[in-house]
């Protein structure tokens, strides 16, 4: 598969098409892209919230209430893959488009003045990535300081949707934080976490491959959270499990192989940007996947 650094979300594909050769995909340098990025979320964790966690947990947004558009308050909520499900007091379970209109209220500390404030997040629409897909897309809106609902995911090319992922990432290192059963990230489609789900690396099934993908999308060679790419840089992506397979007519030079901690090997003459300032020493790549990497990237041959 060839991939390209673009800001807009990739085309929606059917689950059957998610496995196989594709021409162009998006890769970029942002780990996630929500309007929350200007906030310090309870100190140091970015984008994570807990569906049923204790308040004032320190590492996550405090979810204070979850109310359905029709169906009343939620007593229990969880993710099934990327689908949010919620149970009300009568025991009825809601999911998919039934959650349109639901509002989540939570507390956070605003970076601007260190004041703890209540914020509200609304589910404006819910669709599948494609008919029959197990990937769900959420149009999420956050109410701003003057009471206007604004898109949560507002990328360079305009608002986009989010994919809900049952994990939390450290915004500095890009590492996936140790699993917490009820932790959720609203991953915008135009940034690495969401893109990798769309590429077929579903973290509820392929956690290590998904984390590996978030490294390679951002050219985070050393696994330290520092990206070495820009938008609109084309790359080729392939793995050995058949999620992304070589495009038959693609001509490319191997850039690197990757695991969840960054690159396992790197061909310095084939990096996406010329002579990047890399803080680690990596061996050159030999035969395909001899380095122990899970996914391989390449750049178009000159």
Regions found by a protein language model. Name each.
Residues 2-3:
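C-terminal motif of bacterial Sec signal peptides marking the signal peptidase cleavage site
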């Amino acid at each position: 598969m060839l991939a390209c650094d673009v800001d807009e979300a990739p085309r929606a594909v059917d689950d059957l098409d998610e496995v196989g050769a594709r021409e162009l995909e998006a890769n970029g340098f942002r780990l996630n892209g929500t309007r929350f990025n200007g906030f310090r979320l309870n100190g140091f964790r970015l984008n994570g919230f807990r569906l049923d966690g204790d308040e004032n947990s320190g590492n996550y947004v405090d979810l204070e209430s979850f109310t359905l558009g029709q169906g009343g308050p939620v007593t229990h909520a969880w993710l099934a893959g990327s689908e949010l499900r919620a149970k009300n007091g009568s025991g009825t379970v809601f999911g998919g488009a039934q959650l349109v209109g639901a509002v989540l209220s939570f507390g956070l500390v605003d970076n601007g003045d260190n004041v703890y404030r209540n914020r509200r997040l609304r589910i404006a629409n819910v669709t599948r990535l494609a008919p029959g897909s197990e990937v769900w897309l959420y149009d999420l809106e956050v109410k701003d300081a003057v009471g206007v609902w604004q898109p949560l995911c507002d990328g360079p090319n305009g608002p986009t949707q989010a994919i809900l992922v049952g994990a939390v990432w450290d915004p500095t290192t890009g590492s996936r934080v140790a699993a917490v059963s009820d932790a959720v990230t609203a991953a915008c489609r135009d940034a690495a976490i969401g893109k990798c789900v769309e590429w077929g690396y579903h973290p509820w099934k392929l956690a290590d491959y998904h984390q590996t993908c978030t490294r390679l999308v951002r050219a985070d060679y050393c696994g330290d959270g520092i990206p070495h790419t820009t938008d609109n840089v084309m790359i080729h992506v392939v793995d050995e499990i058949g999620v992304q397979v070589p495009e038959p007519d693609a001509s490319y030079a191997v850039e690197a192989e990757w695991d969840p901690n960054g690159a396992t090997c790197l061909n310095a003459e084939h990096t996406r940007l010329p002579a990047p300032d890399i803080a680690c020493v990596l061996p050159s790549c030999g035969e395909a996947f001899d380095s122990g990497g899970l996914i391989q990237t390449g750049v178009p041959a000159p």
